[in-house]
Design a protein with these regions (language model features):
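Core alpha/beta nucleotide-donor-binding catalytic domains of modification enzymes
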Residues: 1-69, 75-94
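Short catalytic/ligand-binding loop motif for oxyanion handling, primarily in non-cytosolic enzymes
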Residues: 37-41, 78-81, 118-122, 135-139
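A short helix->loop->beta-strand "cap" motif at the edges of active sites that frequently abuts
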Residues: 66-68, 105, 124
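Conserved S-adenosyl-L-methionine
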Residues: 76, 105-116
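Conserved Class I S-adenosyl-L-methionine
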Residues: 87-107
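Internal, well-ordered alpha/beta segment that forms a basic, Gly-enriched binding/recognition surface
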Residues: 96, 112, 158
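S-adenosyl-L-methionine-dependent DNA methyltransferase catalytic core
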Residues: 125, 129-247
């Protein structure tokens, strides 16, 4: 009754409500969450952002379907209070926890840094697990307990730097005419220099041709100058903002 496609959750809650009710107690796991843009600390964090209201639609969906377990993911900003006209507004994370608890779920949540699993970026995410019949804390304990084993099985270091991740994609390894875009140069693979690169390339059959979707931009002189100014003047390890007057 539901096509495999993108759907508006509000429309599903309206048009397919009876179908959802028929699923009650039959679903093992619901995984997902609302869009992250409205909660991100890098964004505007507008209290009127309509996307943030999808949290309530999510709770309504869970209330109707009553899955045995659910996994909810969002940015770290989901746990940070919004500032409204009348002071701070409750963290959305606490709202979700309270509502799920009211629905009879046992709930646990953590901030997980995926860089600890050899992902080459410091990406902190709010992860929530809720269960009807089991302790959700067991999931996070298993995640922590198996971190080292996970990396070892994949042949990865506990931490992966950007250089270790993409040094084999540098332009100095060679270029060729892009096979799918005229007037652009594509990059060629360099030698594998890390466990991460070996893992990422394990299913690449022909590693002597152009890297898939790896085209070099044809920058104008103005953009090249801007990039050079940024490289020469921007402080390291700091986010660039308009206040820096570099753009």
């Amino acid at each position: 009754w539901l096509e495999i496609n993108n759907h508006d959750i509000n429309k599903i809650l309206t048009d397919k409500i009876e179908n959802l009710r028929n699923l009650q107690g039959k679903i093992d796991l619901v995984a997902g969450g609302p869009p992250c843009q409205g909660f991100s600390l890098a964004g505007k964090r507008d209290t009127k952002d309509q996307r943030n209201k999808l949290v309530k639609a999510y709770i309504k969906f869970i209330e109707i379907v009553q899955p045995r377990a659910l996994i909810f993911e969002n940015v770290h900003g989901f746990t940070v209070k919004f500032k409204g006209n009348k002071g701070s507004i409750k963290e959305y994370s606490n709202y979700v926890i309270e509502k799920l608890t009211e629905l009879g779920y046992r709930v646990d949540s953590r901030i997980v840094d995926v860089s600890e699993f050899s992902v080459p970026q410091k990406r902190r995410r709010f992860i929530l697990v809720a269960m009807k019949d089991h302790n959700p804390s067991d999931v996070f304990e298993a995640l922590e307990r198996n971190k080292q084993n996970f990396c070892e099985q994949k042949g990865l270091n506990p931490k992966t730097t950007i250089f270790e991740a993409i040094s084999d994609l540098q332009k100095n390894h060679g270029t060729c005419q892009s096979p799918d875009t005229k007037h652009f140069q594509a990059g060629l693979y360099g030698q594998i220099e890390s466990g991460y690169q070996k893992l990422m390339r394990q299913n690449v059959e022909n590693q002597t041709v152009a890297v898939d979707s790896h085209r070099f931009v044809n920058h104008s002189e103005t953009i090249i100058k801007l990039h050079n100014d940024l490289l020469n003047n921007a402080p390291r390890g700091k986010r660039i903002t308009p206040k820096d007057n570099l753009v």
